[in-house]
Curated annotation (Swiss-Prot):
Protein name: Trigger factor
Keyword tags: Cell cycle, Cell division, Chaperone, Cytoplasm, Isomerase, Rotamase
EC number in record: 5.2.1.8
HAMAP family, per database record: Trigger_factor_Tig
Length: 426
């Protein structure tokens, strides 16, 4: 066997495999005999047609099958010997068949050769989110909203109230049109953006008042005017947090306000600790990609584009709305997909340079750590799951990523900056 490797680009190669008759002859004869047994030719009993006629009729098909098998047999062997790192499946692009020689040309993408620049001098800022008593109260109030009651109030509307009224669209003369009227429309003000014209106009108004509003938001096709005749202001009244309500809310998991409040704090702290780590990892990866703009194979970009597309689809309930342009979305996501591919290669290179690996002991330690967070499974059960064929690759990849992350963090300078948690509304 002879081989010739041609670099087409940083991420593409072509491999020419040249085989002698001794190397492909046995496979060729087997395929010829198989064809001879199965092909029915008029004038000959099945399996008794001459080889020359079989070659004439089925030769191209036999040659293609032999080339495919020989390529499959030798490509892996050559890739290992030459330390080729394929990023895509090899495709046959040319076959030259002669009685004494078979030439097969394969095209494939590769992981490019590169070195990660020294990053020990990089400095990053990590947000350290501070959880205050006010944050805990706000979070509990969000939970209590699901158990509150809407009561009518004879007061000016607050930005957290619900304003109910009839909505008329006004014509150019400023007159109402009953054909363009919406009865008893509910404006839940706190869920409208602060700059929304309806929120701004209705806040501070009382039942019985009439308000003219010009909707000139960018999302509107053209400016339009409305009149809202307010009939009612409703305000959400939260229930008092008691031990009994805690039992109801948590399904008996907690029995006292004190324990429930402590758990809310723990959940917030864990959430924002994870958020802080994710933000730092995003900063680290962005910097390393910027400093190491490694070319990404198209097959990897396509794979990540598909992943992003499927993620978006799941967020929309499993399917896109009618008329959604999948291809346009892929194009829009391509820069993001390319960064995912670049980060994968950079992190793999860091792992390779540090000779990182994941042992059974690593998996056991990870299972022990996860067991501390679980109330339903012990470490042995979790370990058994992690070592199963269905989960082992996933958990190995998770632990390896953690090791890579720790290596990067150990080499760079990280300063902490206290930050208030963002206020969320539901």
């Amino acid at each position: 066997m002879q081989k010739n490797i041609k670099n087409v680009s940083e991420t593409e190669q072509e491999l020419e495999i040249i085989l002698s008759a001794e190397e492909f002859g046995t496979e060729y004869n087997q395929e010829l005999e198989e064809a001879k047994r199965n092909i029915q030719i008029k004038g000959f009993r099945k399996g008794h047609a001459p080889a020359s006629l079989i070659k004439k009729l089925a030769g191209p098909s036999i040659e293609a099958t032999v080339a495919e098998k020989m390529a499959s047999k030798y490509f892996g062997e050559i890739a290992d010997a030459e330390k080729i790192k394929p990023a895509s499946r090899a495709q046959i692009i040319d076959v030259a068949f002669a009685p004494e020689e078979l030439k097969i040309t394969l095209a494939y993408e590769i992981h490019p050769e590169f070195e990660v620049k020294d990053f020990s001098g990089y400095t990053f800022t990590q947000n350290r989110y501070v959880i205050t008593d006010e944050d805990i109260t706000r979070e509990i109030n969000l939970i209590l909203k699901g158990h509150g009651t809407l009561n009518t109030v004879d007061e000016a509307a607050l930005s957290t109230d619900t304003v109910i009224g009839d909505v008329y669209k006004l014509n150019e003369a400023g007159e109402t049109d009953d054909d363009q009227k919406t009865d008893n429309h509910h404006f839940t003000l706190e869920y409208l953006p602060e700059e929304n014209p309806f929120r701004k106009a209705l806040t501070g108004k009382k039942a019985g008042e009439s308000v003219d509003i010009e909707n000139d938001e960018k999302e509107s096709a053209q400016p339009s005017r409305f009149r809202v005749v307010i009939s009612e202001i409703k305000r959400l009244e939260l229930p008092e947090l008691t031990d009994e309500l805690v039992k109801e809310i948590t399904g008996g998991r907690f029995e006292s306000v004190t324990d429930f409040t402590a758990d809310v704090r723990i959940q917030l702290e864990q959430h924002f600790l994870l958020k802080s780590d994710e933000e730092l990892l995003e900063s680290l990866s962005a910097k390393l990609i910027e400093e190491n703009p490694v070319p990404a194979p198209n097959s990897m970009i396509a794979s990540f584009s598909k992943m992003l597309l499927e993620n978006a689809k799941r967020q929309m309930g499993g399917s896109f709305p009618k008329g959604f342009d999948d291809e346009q979305f892929r194009l829009a996501m391509k820069p993001n997909a390319e960064k995912h591919a670049q980060w994968l290669m950079i992190s793999q290179k860091i792992a390779e340079d540090a000779t990182l690996s994941v042992s059974d002991d690593d998996i056991k330690a990870y299972a022990d750590k996860e067991a501390e967070k679980s109330e339903s499974m012990d470490a042995e059960e979790i370990l058994k799951t992690y070592l199963s064929p269905e989960f082992r690759d996933y958990i190995t990849d998770t632990i390896l990523k953690e090791k890579i992350y720790n290596i990067i963090k150990s080499k760079v300078t990280i300063t902490e900056e206290e930050k208030s948690i963002p206020v969320r509304q539901e």
